[in-house]
A protein has these predicted regions:
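Conserved SAM-binding strand-loop segment of SAM-dependent methyltransferases
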Residues: 124-134
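A short SAM/SAH-binding and catalytic strip from SAM-dependent methyltransferases
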Residues: 142-159
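Conserved beta-strand signature within the Rossmann-like core of class I S-adenosyl-L-methionine
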Residues: 172-180
Length: 259
């Protein structure tokens, strides 16, 4: 994600509509329908004590226009590493699913946002509305999982997310992940917000740079097979090992956390 930004002066709280569900009934859905921002993820400050409700913190811009455009050069480098069938977790408006489908690579997008699923289908891709922590189509048979555009933060606990994704690919399957461009390792509470201060409800999120990502991935049994940067973005390629013994050790190590 880009550097923190500042919003214009906000309207009075009494003038704002009631916050909707994250990603489904908030400014994100409107931005996907129009293909335009500005849109932000606002970091919420934790409460100082039990009587403090916390407050508003820095803004992290969300690159809606890029998500709604055709794949760029950095995206294309990722797509060239895909072995079908491909599952795009948090597919957003579906640029990657649509591009793979156009090349004849079987691909499916998964997203909790109805607007994201609808836009993916409009672009000619297949998508289902579902959480990654729910039962997914074709579990254990996907050749590649994509986790792009900051979606490593889904659920707020990357250890749990990466452990879950190991169950979605077979031994030898791969995971292509976009890490934060900076060396960060944080768990936070955020909300999606537009330039007018309209926002959805808070939800847990996480941000990991490549170093923290690799430590977390190793802890749940993924093996590093590639790492690169392109157009200011950072990417990692991981594989689920083919060794059954390695899988058993990883399962034992990640058994304490549940989504």
């Amino acid at each position: 994600m880009a550097r923190p930004a500042r919003l214009p002066a906000q309207s009075h709280p009494a003038d704002r509509p009631r916050p909707g569900e994250p990603w489904t009934d908030d400014p994100y859905a409107h931005a996907l329908r129009t293909g335009r921002g500005p849109l932000f993820m606002r970091r919420l400050r934790p409460p100082v004590d039990r009587d403090d409700a916390g407050g508003e913190g820095e803004l992290l811009p969300l690159d809606v226009e890029r998500w709604c455009a055709a794949p760029d050069a950095a995206d294309t480098g990722v797509l060239q590493r895909c072995a079908g069938p491909v599952l795009d977790v948090g597919c957003g408006p579906g640029r990657l699913v649509a591009a793979l489908t156009a090349e004849g690579v079987p691909a499916l997008g998964v997203d909790v946002s109805p607007a994201a699923v609808a836009r993916t289908r409009q672009r000619g891709g297949a998508a289902v509305r579902r959480s990654v922590f729910d039962r997914l189509p074709g579990e254990g048979r996907w050749g590649t999982i994509l986790l792009m555009d900051g979606n490593l933060g889904i659920g707020g606990d990357p250890l749990v997310l990466l452990a879950r994704l190991r169950t979605v690919v077979p031994p030898g399957g791969r995971l292509l992940v976009e890490a934060a461009p900076h060396d960060v390792d944080e768990r936070l509470t955020v909300r999606v917000e537009d330039a007018h201060g309209r926002h959805g409800r808070p939800f847990p999120w996480a941000r990991l740079g490549a170093t923290a990502l690799l430590h977390t991935a190793e802890a749940v049994g993924w093996i590093l097979t590639g790492r690169w940067a392109d157009e200011g973005r950072s990417f990692v390629e991981l594989h689920r090992p083919r060794s059954r013994q390695h899988d058993e050790r990883a399962s034992a190590g990640g058994r304490t956390e549940q989504p």
